[in-house]
Amino acid sequence: MTLRECIKQLPDSAGVYQYFDKDGHLLYIGKAKSLAKRVKSYFNFAPKFKPNSNLSSRISKMISQTHTLQYIVVNSEHDALILENSLIKQLMPKYNILLRDDKTYPYIYIDNSQKYPRFEMTRKIIKSSNIKYYGPFSVGARDILDSIYELCALVQKKGSLTSKKLCLYHQINRCLGPCELHVSDEDYQRELDLAKELILNKKILIKKLQEKMFYYADNLRFEEATALRDRCERISRSEIKSEIDFASSENYDIFVIASSQSRAVVVRIFMREGKIISSSHDYIQLHEGYDEDELYQRAIMGFYSHGKPPIIAPILVASEFEGKDSIEEFLSTLFEKKADIKVPKTAKRKQLIDLALLNAAELLKNETKENQSGILDEIKKLFSLQRVPSRVETFDNSHMSGVATVGAMSVYENGAFDKKSYRIYHLEARDEYAQMREMLLRRVESFLKNPPPDLWILDGGSTLLNLALSILESSGVNIDVIAIAKEKVDAKAHRAKGKAKDIIYSREDIFKLLDSDKRLHFVQKLRDEAHRCAINFHKKTKLKSDNESKLLTLKGISQAKIIKLLKHFTTFDAIKEASVEELSTVLNLKDANIIKSSYI
């Protein structure tokens, strides 16, 4: 069936549609209240079947590449919105705008049902009328919480009240001591009120921290003074600079977008009880034009898709966007109350939008990430990538004669290594091909929870490159892949520097770049970081394995028998968990009992 025939048979139902090019690569995922009307709007049918002349250059180019169409019918536009958002995060279509800020932000909360309430941090929201939440905080939540307990005489630890005995915190005036002393509700409430003021007003918080810092310095407690100085700097850096204070209890979530020629930034600002308490931002690499409507949809859906927030605030945006009604319907269902997305009309609320736009422009202007030197653009051009790789995942494995086999994934995003996103893998496979396959399959399985990157880099040659491409194709995921390996000398690949050059493999070509080429240096830097991570994890795993092996050797189990066990069970943890019956299928019953008793 031709594309034209397929379009003419589309139902007048809500659903999600997917465009593919002639090679079967996914180009775009969209949603529709009516699949027939929406998809037909992309085309002119007479006198010639072609892209609609009213489309933007970006969408027109996409439609000209479209060869086949697939669609999924759902019950409502609301369901289509949710499915579209999920599929885009998993499958990374070429022409969809990809927003990676998919994480949940922490809140600081207090449970007022406790006799002496404490402040704690959480990402999981508990429904209770007694719990009050402050946030969300994109950064700095831990620093704020630590500062509260530094400056306010509250119960410092959860278990303190059960001891019925004064602890060190009371002696250093950081707790009123309700575990043993009589503390009135009024006295404790005073400390709670101060803590709440510090959470909502960063200026007062930083001022009080600086006062304590100077006190420590005057008393030659330089280590403590330095720690507070660093904390003040982190809290200060994390906040939008603003004099805005509504002197009211108003809450708002503000979303704005600004763009340059090749980059856009999404800025979120959170106002709670009339004060700006936190902000966050994300850079987006633009390609093939720019669709602000889609970016607003992705930004708002991505932020709220984790569940109902504890504080439901009106959402302010800088401009109207297509799909706003669908987003409001989705959020109303999620919030269990009417969601409100609006462009502010009053001067007071416009201040918030102006502030967010000012910060967005400043972020674009002052961006000092590595892409400013053009290296990522050059990488895209050299290797014919689909998009500029703002997020790159690099894979390597490490073992010693098949023992302590591990893999590592390093992550490079927006010009820096994102070590919080690194992953390490215990691998069961014996050869390097199977090890890489195991690692990549496990990463693909986690795409729903942690969306795919723009680029994979593998430490290996064309064989591993083709393996990765095959895995991605079978999963329907649209990611670029390159591989880097040492040139073979005397039929051997020498990793040691100076012995052989690095060769880079892409889907379409092989690259032997000069040693001085900065594009080679960039790929090597990412490969070396993954290798470092894999080696370090291997050393730790090997040390643990050696200690376990020594334990069994002391119990009379020979090294040959230990190797036999590892070949069967793969890891010492699996050996520990095995029953005597399972162990006796590999060794004799006497040895099985010795091993089992060794781990009791």
Curated annotation (Swiss-Prot):
Gene Ontology MF term list: DNA binding; excinuclease ABC activity
A GO cellular component annotated for this chain's UniProt record is: excinuclease repair complex
**By its UniProt entry, which InterPro entries does this protein fall under?**
GIY-YIG_endonuc, GIY-YIG_endonuc_sf, GIY-YIG_UvrC_Cho, RuvA_2-like, UVR_dom, UVR_dom_sf, UvrABC_protein_C, UvrC
> Looking at the keywords, is Cytoplasm present?
yes
Do you know which CDD domains this protein is assigned to?
GIY-YIG_UvrC_Cho (cd10434)
Q: Where in the cell is it found?
A: Cytoplasm
Give start and end of each GIY-YIG domain: 12-97
Q: Which UniProt keywords apply?
A: Cytoplasm, DNA damage, DNA excision, DNA repair, Excision nuclease, SOS response
Q: Which PANTHER family match?
A: UVRABC SYSTEM PROTEIN C (PTHR30562:SF1), UVRC/OXIDOREDUCTASE (PTHR30562)
Question: Its function?
Answer: The UvrABC repair system catalyzes the recognition and processing of DNA lesions. UvrC both incises the 5' and 3' sides of the lesion. The N-terminal half is responsible for the 3' incision and the C-terminal half is responsible for the 5' incision.
Subunit arrangement? Interacts with UvrB in an incision complex.
Its name, as the record gives it, is UvrABC system protein C
The species this protein belongs to is Sulfurimonas denitrificans (strain ATCC 33889 / DSM 1251)
As recorded in Swiss-Prot or TrEMBL, the protein's gene is named uvrC
